[in-house]
Each structure stands twice: as structure tokens, then as C-alpha cells.
From Swiss-Prot:
This is Succinate--CoA ligase [ADP-forming] subunit beta. Residues 9-237 form the ATP-grasp domain. The gene is sucC. Belongs to the succinate/malate CoA ligase beta subunit family. It comes from Chloroflexus aggregans (strain MD-66 / DSM 9485). Heterotetramer of two alpha and two beta subunits. It catalyses: succinate + ATP + CoA = succinyl-CoA + ADP + phosphate; GTP + succinate + CoA = succinyl-CoA + GDP + phosphate. Keywords: ATP-binding, Ligase, Magnesium, Metal-binding, Nucleotide-binding, Tricarboxylic acid cycle. The lineage of its organism: Bacteria, Bacillati, Chloroflexota, Chloroflexia, Chloroflexales. Binds 1 Mg(2+) ion per subunit. NCBIfam families: PRK00696.1 (NF001913), sucCoAbeta (TIGR01016). Its cofactor is Mg(2+). GO terms for cellular component: cytosol; succinate-CoA ligase complex. Gene3D superfamilies: ATP-grasp fold, A domain, ATP-grasp fold, B domain, Succinyl-CoA synthetase domains. GO terms for biological process: succinyl-CoA metabolic process; tricarboxylic acid cycle.
Length: 382
């Protein structure tokens, strides 16, 4: 689950991490009041769950409360990558000397929580990894004792913080960020940039926190922060239908049962020269209604040029999947070509149900992926 910037800022502040002053506004008048309370220049920032807000005009500097009200009026209601801005963060504008980067992630390679730091903050860490990988420092926390003090100090030293006061502050912030990550069941806790202000003190200027959906039952206070209006419509519908769904940038929709099989399906699509439009796992034992909801979600993406069904029926019955596909197509007629690889429990019944449809059959995953790629290119018709 994604937190808005203002929610992430408030969460980190609970752990003693210094953050900017300010507040969230849903009207221009509220933005005016917050800026007036701050009493100096402010930054008005759109609160939406997408990147590139600044380039889209969703981040603006305001020198006065009146200007803050004006720019808030421009940003509120703005459409950024398909999401409507309903809230803005009005934060004090900070003068600073240097930008740093700091984050906590779960490194699945080492199977440990890893702290990442860089002297090059303010830009995407992925870009730094490409252009100057030596500027990135990684230290894995101890699996039972957590991030140790000497590790936090080592992070500070290795990114070039030689001033004792700044190094101590950085180490304290790193320790606090680690605790926030662990105690919130986060999958990412990031401060970018972590700035050194003109007075020499450190401050978290922007932050990002992603929470593990599977851990939210332990954190009702954090679960209550979910903003359905800020989620893409497809992701909201998938969550309500108990479907695991992640939108991607390709044009081949995928419906699969099982996360491992779904990842393998995406891999084979790419190996066949295509690009998956989504990760979608209907789970074990999915019935007709869930399958119907899943297909409707896939078809709601205008980029989808073909759909691949890869169902291995164990707990999930192939005939139930077939009924769900037919039910969805009755409600949402489409010309999008569809390829079906259906094997397992009741597969003969499922195939018989789909025999009169326009679905393109495939005996293997490789064949299904190749046919889906060809269909997306307009080279194969049902």
C-alpha cells in the first residue's frame, strides 16, 4: 500500500526524523491558511501516487499565502498520469547546501533488510545506479539485532560525511528509518532528498513509504490511511475482488492462477518478444465471479491488444474459469484476441464450454505466449 508524501512524512516524524513543517489542504483557502501559519515561502505539492509530479506541474513554489492559494487552485483538480489531484501538501520551503539519499529495503538476494545511502540525492536512485554506481553504499542490517550503531556511522562515513555533528545526525536518522521500516511492515522507506540545510542540520525533505499489504492486519492505524481515490481504478477494483493485480506498461493482458505461474507467464511472454500489460493472479479455487471480475479489469486497460489465459487447474477448476470468461464476455463484448492455455481439473469440460467462442487454444505455455504476441501485433486472428 502506498502512502501519500504527507502521510509518510508524519510516520517518519513519529520516529524522531526531522521533517518539514506544513500541512495538507483540500481547498485553496486551506492552502492559504497553512502558508500563513508557516510565515514564509512554501512549496505546494500534489498528493498523488505517481512519480513525475514536478514535470507535470504538480509541484510549485509560492512566496506568499496569496500565491500559495493561487497555485493550490491550479494544482487541485489537475490530472497527473490519469489520477486527479484532490489534496496538496503545503510545506515550508527549505534552503540547503547538499542533497543525500537514504532508504531501507528488503533485499531478497541477501534475505536481509538493507540500508542504501548515496551522496547523490534528489534524483532517482536507479539513475544513480546507472550513471555512478560507486556513489551508492549498501549495508545489510543484522538479522536479529537490527541496524547496529557502527553500521549507521559507516554509512555516513562512506558517503563522505566527515563533520562529526552531521555524521551523528545521519546515523540517528538511519536508525530511526530502520525502525520505522520494521515496525510498520514496510517494503520501502525512502528519504530523497535528505538535505543538509544551510545551518548544517539534516532534514528529510521528501519521503516515500510502501507498506506490505500482507502486514496491514497488524496495523489498523496505517490501514486506515489508504486513499482509494488516489489508486488507479483497476487496482482498486482488483483489491475489492481479492485479486492480486499490478499494472505494467505492455500490451498483453495476463490472467493466471498462482503467483509463480504468473511470473513465469510474464517471463515467457517477454522471451517471445512481447510485453505483459499486467501481473494478475486470481489465486487458488477462483470461481466464475472472480474470473469475470479479473477479465473486466484486464479489458479496462486501453493498451491491451491481446489476452493470454494460463490456467493450471488444481484447486482451481478449469470449467469454472471458462464460465467466468464467457460471463465476462457477455457483459463486456470485445474484439481483443484471446489465447487460452487451460489444463488440469475439468479441462475437457472447460474446453468444451469455450469451443464455440473466439478464444484461440494453446496446448503449452510457450505456444500460448507466441500466439498472444502474434495476436497483439495483429498477425493472428481468432
Amino acid at each position: 500500500m502506498k502512502l501519500h508524501e504527507y502521510q509518510a512524512r508524519d510516520l517518519l516524524a513519529r520516529y524522531g526524523i526531522p521533517v518539514t513543517g506544513g500541512g495538507v489542504a483540500v481547498t485553496p483557502a486551506e492552502a492559504h491558511a497553512i502558508a500563513e501559519q508557516i510565515g514564509g515561502p512554501v512549496v505546494v505539492k500534489a498528493q498523488v501516487h505517481v512519480g513525475g509530479r514536478g514535470k507535470a506541474g504538480g509541484v510549485k513554489l509560492a512566496q506568499t499565502p496569496a500565491e500559495a492559494e493561487q497555485v493550490a487552485g491550479q494544482i487541485l483538480g489537475m490530472n497527473i498520469k490519469g489520477l486527479t489531484v484532490e489534496k496538496v501538501l503545503v510545506a515550508e520551503a527549505i534552503s540547503y547546501e547538499r542533497e543525500l539519499y537514504l532508504s531501507a529495503i528488503l533485499d531478497r538476494g541477501s534475505k536481509r533488510i538493507t540500508m542504501i545511502a548515496s551522496a547523490e540525492g534528489g534524483v532517482e536512485i536507479e539513475e544513480v545506479a546507472k550513471t555512478n554506481p560507486s556513489a551508492i553504499v549498501k549495508i545489510a542490517a543484522h538479522p536479529t539485532m537490527g541496524l547496529l550503531d557502527f553500521q549507521a556511522r559507516e554509512l555516513a562515513f562512506r558517503i563522505g560525511l566527515r563533520d562529526g555533528k552531521q555524521a551523528r545526525q545521519f546515523a540517528q536518522i538511519a536508525g530511526a528509518l530502520y525502525r520505522a521500516f520494521v515496525e510498520s511492515d514496510a517494503s520501502l522507506a525512502e528519504i530523497n532528498p535528505l538535505v543538509i540545510k544551510n545551518d548544517g542540520n539534516l532534514l528529510a525533505l521528501d519521503s516515500k513509504v510502501l507498506l506490505d499489504e500482507s502486514g496491514l492486519f497488524r496495523h489498523p492505524d496505517l490501514a486506515a490511511l489508504r486513499d482509494p481515490s488516489a489508486e488507479p481504478e483497476a487496482e482498486r477494483r482488483a483489491r475489492e475482488a481479492d485479486i492480486t493485480f499490478i499494472k505494467l506498461d505492455g500490451n498483453i493482458g495476463c490472467m493466471v492462477n498462482g503467483a509463480g505461474l504468473a511470473m513465469a507467464t510474464m517471463d515467457v511472454i517477454k522471451l517471445s518478444g512481447g510485453e505483459p500489460a499486467n501481473f494478475l493472479d486470481i489465486g487458488g479455487g477462483a470461481g466464475k465471479e472472480k474470473v469475470k471480475a479479473a477479465l473486466q479489469i484486464i479489458l479496462s486497460d486501453p493498451n491491451v491488444k491481446a489476452v493470454l489465459f494460463n490456467i493450471f487447474g488444481g484447486i482451481t477448476r478449469v470449467d469454472e474459469v471458462a464460465r467466468g470468461i464467457l460471463a465476462a464476455l457477455e457483459e463486456v463484448p470485445t474484439d481483443v484476441p484471446m489465447v487460452a492455455r487451460l489444463v488440469g481439473t475439468n479441462e475437457e469440460v472447460g474446453r468444451a464450454l469455450l469451443a464455440g467462442s473466439k478464444l484461440i487454444p494453446a496446448a503449452t505455455l510457450a505456444e500460448g505466449a507466441q500466439k498472444a504476441v502474434a495476436a497483439a501485433r495483429g498477425e493472428l486472428v481468432s
